Amino acid sequence: KSPKSWGLNTIANSPDKDIFMRRKTPYVERFEIKGPALSGKAAWWPFRDPFDPAFRKNVADNLKSRSGMTDDPWCIGFFVDNEIHWGDKFDLARFTIMSPASLAGKIRFKGELEKKYGGISGLNGAWGTKFADWDAFLQNREVPKGADKKDLEDFTSLMAEEYFKVIREEFDKFAPNKLYLGCRFAGSNENVVRIGAKYCDAVSYNRYADNLKKLKLPAGIDKPVMIGEWHFGALDRGPFHPSLIKRENQADRADSYYEYAKSALENPNVVGIHWHQFSDQAATGRFDGENFQVGLTDVCDTPYAETIAKIREIGRDLYRIRQAAPLP
């Protein structure tokens, strides 16, 4: 009952199923794709190879296993994956080169290069390499210093395109009435955002910042934006870590909540912001030691009155602020 009385209108990512299946509040859900992954740097989750048949099957299986949600009018839609490391406009190709020869994506990369260069001598001339044959290209796991930037950029774009396209196609088959809410960018590049916007119903970001005044989609892209995570924390009460965005005390934290939410309402593309998280984390830490003071309630389920007051205040001001926002 508390969230509704505070003015909150959805249950955010990764909720307790026993709560959202009471069907009293609209909710979203998330799943992560499993399967063969690219080598190279990863964030929370590695980048799964969208050219491997297991990728498509895993997306389909995840959606089919959620048939109670895909048919539920209270379910808004699904995020897929979380905080993938996209890197720059060349990195997915670099990660592919660093991967084993058996990776489906690497075999596809070889095929694209064969179409462009024909024999291996053409690639060697362009990249400054000395591969004996195309199998040697597959076996190699070091990114050549002279690798053609256009080739890397083109394949990175192709892999991103395949990633979003396959997910979109499986949504259309198994969850046609639900929104594909994107992958919760926590770092990306403009090209990937452009590609994702073609297939996602909303572009999602985990955006830890003072506000959203600097959040802009690439030029020419007009798409709804969802904020999957944001928060502020302070050390005057609660656990012993002030969170990713520190504030001096609970009053300062509450004011920051209002200002962030206000900046979202002033951005005509932003359609929702999901606070991370409902309760403080345990003082002893979660699996990775994280013990942030980020809750709307403490670990004993006592609300932080200062923040709750500001949540209610922005709820009262919501339509006035939104109606004054510029058109996209």
Tell what function each PLM region has.
Residues 1-2, 6-9, 39-61, 113, ...:
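The substrate-binding groove and active-site-proximal loops of carbohydrate-active enzymes
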Residues 1-70, 164-175, 192, 197-198, ...:
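Aromatic-lined substrate-binding rim segments of carbohydrate-active enzymes
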Residues 3, 11, 78, 119, ...:
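Conserved, mostly hydrophobic/aromatic
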Residues 12, 73-77, 81-83, 230, ...:
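Substrate-binding cleft of secreted/luminal carbohydrate-active enzymes
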Residues 38-48, 138-153, 186, 221-260, ...:
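Active-site clefts of carbohydrate-active enzymes
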Residues 48, 72-193:
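Polysaccharide-binding and catalytic clefts of secreted carbohydrate-active enzymes
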Residues 93-108, 276-328:
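Aromatic-rich peripheral "rim/lid" segments of glycoside hydrolase catalytic domains that contact
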Residues 154, 158-243, 258-265:
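Glycoside hydrolase catalytic-domain groove-lining segments
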